[in-house]
């Protein structure tokens, strides 16, 4: 498992200094940065391409640059939320999952299982409530 780490300097030469890396292989890297960068927006930063405008301050990117599918954007969101399971991340993930379930795929993932429990009205520690998700998702 790749752990999100705050890199000081150029720990990976593909990304700007100070980036947070969420996932990487030899061929691709998923990261967030405040710096301007020539990379493909992904995860929560690409939700606006699918009709969802988030208010998250971080910007998420993937290299190499390429056209991403909805499934790839959703998978990158899951990777970000795995490493930073904040309520805002989980709320936006739930909204995207509800709106685009058939197109994004219902990938079996522990986070999706918990989101599905929330959508059934269950209380899941650390996750938004059903009302919170529905309130923002309207």
Residue ranges and their predicted role:
Residues 1-2:
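Basic, Lys/Arg-rich alpha-helical nucleic-acid-recognition elements, primarily the DNA-binding modules
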Residues 55-138:
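Hydrophobic alpha-helical interaction segments
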């Amino acid at each position: 498992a790749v752990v999100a780490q705050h890199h000081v300097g150029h720990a990976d030469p593909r990304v700007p200094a100070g980036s947070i890396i969420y996932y990487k292989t030899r061929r691709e890297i998923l990261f967030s940065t405040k710096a301007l960068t020539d990379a493909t927006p992904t995860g929560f930063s690409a939700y606006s391409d699918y009709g969802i405008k988030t208010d998250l301050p971080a910007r998420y990117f993937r290299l190499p640059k390429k056209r991403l599918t909805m499934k790839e954007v959703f998978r990158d969101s899951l990777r970000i939320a795995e490493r930073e399971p904040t309520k805002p991340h989980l709320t936006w993930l739930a909204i995207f999952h509800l709106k685009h379930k058939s197109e994004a795929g219902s990938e079996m993932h522990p986070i999706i299982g918990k989101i599905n429990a929330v959508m059934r009205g269950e209380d899941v520690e650390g996750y938004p409530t059903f009302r919170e998700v529905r309130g923002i998702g309207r």
